[in-house]
Regions:
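Hydrophobic alpha-helical membrane-insertion segments
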Residues: 64-77, 173-174
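Short, well-ordered turn and helix-capping elements at secondary-structure junctions
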Residues: 8-10, 93, 131-133
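Pocket-edge positions in alpha/beta enzyme catalytic cores
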Residues: 6-10, 97, 115
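Short membrane-interfacial helix/loop motifs at transmembrane-helix boundaries
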Residues: 1-16, 89
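Alpha-helical transmembrane segments of integral membrane proteins
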Residues: 16-56, 71, 88, 98-184
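Extracellular/periplasmic helix-loop junction at the C-terminal end of a transmembrane helix
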Residues: 71-98
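Membrane-interface segments at loop-to-transmembrane junctions
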Residues: 58-62
């Protein structure tokens, strides 16, 4: 019915309070997912094209570390470094966009990065796996036999096919980001 009842502390309806905070959560999740995808797609493609190289192994280890660290712990570490120690960014709070774009962005940087790193690390692994699958397809082998480089064959013939499983996983990850955004 959409009625969450009344707050025990303020005796106000909870529904408008939840809706006010939902806007903030959706902005945070949207920006974090965009940042996660913007980092995961090129890094995952690079990992697949450089599979089993020393550099790819180091980056893969970094993605495993990114997956292992919970977003709330990363958020605490980022606040300790960039807000408390260096004083570059605010430690908490929310500034609506109508109160100045600069302050709005400054207050979003740390939570967006904390959410995006964990999700981006997971998406990077999925992108790598999807691109590796595509690179072993017959149409990529044919393109390579016709003289295209691995990157060119992937760009022209394989990216659309590799994107399908990644976008599916990204959609599922949006739900986990809601939990992370609430905690952060």
């Amino acid at each position: 019915t959409g009625n969450f009842g009344q707050s025990l502390s303020s005796q106000q309806d909870i529904t408008p309070l939840v809706l006010d905070r939902a806007q903030v959560t959706l902005i945070l999740i949207g920006l974090a997912m965009l940042l996660a995808l913007a980092g995961a797609i090129p890094v995952g493609m690079w990992l697949a094209l450089r599979n089993r190289s020393r550099g790819a192994d180091v980056v893969s280890a970094g993605t495993q570390l990114g997956i292992a660290v919970p977003s709330f712990l990363l958020g605490i570490i980022l606040v300790a470094i960039f807000a408390v120690h260096l004083g570059w960014l605010p430690a908490n709070g929310w500034v609506p966009p109508n109160q100045g774009a600069g302050e709005f962005i400054r207050h979003l940087i740390l939570p967006v990065i904390a959410l995006a790193v964990v999700q981006g690390a997971m998406l990077t692994r999925y992108v790598r796996s999807a691109v590796l699958d595509v690179l072993h397809q017959d149409y990529i082998r044919t393109a390579r036999a016709l003289g295209q480089s691995p990157w060119e064959a992937l760009k022209r013939h394989g990216l659309r096919n590799a994107a399908l499983p990644v976008l599916t996983v990204a959609g599922v990850q949006l739900t986990t980001m809601v939990v992370g955004a609430v905690v952060i």
